[in-house]
Amino acid sequence: IMMAYHRERGVETRLVRIFNTYGPRMRLDDGRVLPTFMKQALSDEPISIFGDGSQTRSFCFVDDLVEGIVRLLYSDEVQPVNLGNPQEITIGTFAEEVVALTNSSSTISYHPLPEDDPKVRCPDITRAFEVLGWTPSVEREDGLAMSLDYFIEEVGKLSGPRAPFRKSERPLGRMGSRGAVQRRAKLRQRARTKNPRI
């Protein structure tokens, strides 16, 4: 519909295809894999995997997505642009990363794979790089670390403080909590430097 308005009426439009995005403020009950895994891991419940865990997905941190959208808004590109992270990971490996990050005792629970579940889901971001100069910059390990405190707080609202999980034991990866905050600040500053109108 938007493209029709652009072609017929000259309306200025921008089209973005958003692929798997994650970060703080995700709803625990939205059905997506990260909040589901986080909720289960922080509650020491079995991690639910559908199929054998070999299917791949890719995850783009919200800060990267926002930067891509802003660049598109200030560009002259009218064709659809894919925004996502092309780095694939198997669901099984992703579950293991979440368990390790949360210091959880959760085990993996396998369930039948839905018939319509895709084996691979990964964006082609060639156009985003060519016309916007955009590629995601936040490593998955860092993005998960920057999201952890939020999920701990949200799960705590449901069941109270998680007794087995002590803050001093939290494995936040190479960034650490202070590094996570600093990285987010640098991402925002970089976006402003690349486009002063942000």
Language-model regions: role of each:
Residues I1-R14, L42-S43:
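Active-site Tyr-X1-5-Lys
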Residues N20, P24, A41-R190, R197-I198:
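C-terminal substrate-binding subdomain of Rossmann-fold SDR/epimerase-dehydratase oxidoreductases
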Residues M2, F37, A95:
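Aromatic/hydrophobic pocket-lining residues that form π-stacking "cages" and hydrophobic walls in ligand
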Residues R32-L34, V99-A100:
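Glycine-rich, phosphate-binding/catalytic loops in enzymes
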Residues V11-R32:
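Flexible, glycine-rich beta-alpha linker
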